[in-house]
């Protein structure tokens, strides 16, 4: 049975995870998402407990007396100094009491104490509320990932889409050291605007040469998406082999991450990706090995929502508009 909302908030406390929270977290996620949340381990209290004990996640918990009514987590990256934030939920009976804000504040403190240089979140675009919360805490929008959210996802039995929905990526960086970047001409202005909004100084690196190298790739079965990591110039043959491998996994979306700091001349790689159906998604800071990447995206299904995505800010709306226009542009390549 769902808890009864309080007359006041005195007994609502926010703290880091203790083992006895695990069962309440699983109950809360089920209450908010039913059985649709893609990180399946959150439905198993033992798995939640183990994930926290091993550092796979760092849970922030809100509780009312002995009942877990809120959850937010840091998900440390394996090969970077940043973390992802996610697995966010507040019991519907306790909405509008500032619980998410309190968890977010402790999340920031915890990330800093762990030595993380920042974090990012992917706000589901079925509603604008997570985007609003992220912006209020100083996060900056950098990308829109079309089709990342499966059509099976449902929030509070209210927010759902028959098509794959999108995610708005936002960052909060504690370390804003100057970057040396290779900016492709096609996307120079919007990448520069993204860095400026994030208050990250940069200068453009002189073009350099690098050997052609096969890209790495990854398949996320839970989300039905694939990713390509490109740290050196890309050949058409390597791209085709990678696409065939990911498409054989029935990836609905494929994201191509192009290193902005590793090799100086990326124009040919960007043109090759455009001709194979990849269009703009945005910038991902400190994504792999602590370096920044330009992310492009490719649709392998028409079941992707582009009309009803919710954007909270003007820049978010501008970013989505740019992405859709770039998709129309590359569609002319056939």
Regions found by a protein language model. Name each.
Residues 130-134, 273:
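Conserved active-site tyrosine of GNAT-family acetyltransferases
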Residues 2-43, 53, 61-63, 68, ...:
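Short amphipathic alpha-helix that is part of the acyltransferase structural core
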Residues 122, 138-160, 279-291:
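Conserved catalytic-core motifs of GNAT/GCN5-like acyltransferases
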Residues 149-183, 289-319:
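C-terminal "cap" of GNAT-fold acetyltransferases
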Residues 181, 187-286, 293:
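Non-catalytic interaction/regulatory modules that flank or connect domains
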Residues 90, 96-111, 121, 237-244:
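Conserved acetyl-CoA-binding loop-helix of GNAT-fold acetyltransferases
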Residues 111-125, 250-260:
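Conserved GNAT acetyl-CoA-binding A-motif
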Residues 16-92, 218-220, 232-236, 240-243, ...:
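A conserved beta-strand-loop-helix scaffold within acyl/acetyltransferase catalytic domains
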């Amino acid at each position: 049975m769902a808890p009864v909302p309080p007359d006041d908030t005195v007994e609502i406390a926010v703290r880091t995870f203790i083992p006895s929270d695990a069962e309440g977290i699983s109950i809360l996620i089920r209450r908010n998402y039913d059985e649709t949340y893609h990180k399946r381990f959150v439905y198993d209290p033992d798995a939640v407990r183990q994930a926290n004990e091993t550092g796979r996640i760092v849970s922030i918990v809100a509780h009312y007396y002995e009942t877990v009514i809120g959850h937010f987590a840091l998900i440390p990256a394996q090969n970077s100094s940043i973390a992802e934030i996610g697995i966010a939920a507040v019991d519907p009976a306790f909405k509008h009491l500032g619980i998410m804000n309190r968890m977010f504040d402790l999340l920031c403190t915890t990330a800093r104490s762990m030595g993380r240089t920042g974090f990012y979140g992917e706000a589901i675009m079925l509603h604008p509320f997570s985007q609003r919360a992220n912006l209020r805490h100083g996060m900056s929008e950098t990308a829109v990932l079309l089709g990342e959210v499966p059509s099976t996802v449902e929030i509070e039995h209210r927010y759902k889409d028959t098509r794959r929905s999108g995610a708005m990526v936002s960052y909060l960086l504690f370390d804003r050291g100057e970057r040396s970047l290779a900016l492709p001409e096609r996307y120079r202005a919007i990448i520069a605007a993204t860095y400026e909004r994030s208050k990250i100084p940069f200068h453009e690196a002189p073009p350099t040469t690098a050997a052609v190298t096969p890209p790495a790739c990854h398949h996320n079965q839970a989300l039905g998406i694939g990713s390509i990591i490109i740290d050196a110039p890309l050949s058409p043959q390597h791209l085709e082999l990678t696409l065939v491998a990911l498409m054989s996994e029935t990836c609905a979306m494929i994201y191509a991450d192009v290193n902005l700091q590793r090799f100086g001349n990326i124009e040919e790689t960007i043109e090759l990706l455009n001709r194979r159906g990849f269009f703009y998604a945005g910038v991902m800071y400190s994504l792999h090995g602590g370096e920044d990447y330009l992310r492009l995206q490719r649709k392998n299904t028409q079941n992707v929502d582009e009309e009803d995505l919710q954007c909270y800010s003007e820049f978010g709306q501008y970013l989505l508009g740019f992405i859709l226009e770039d998709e129309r542009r590359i569609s002319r390549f056939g």
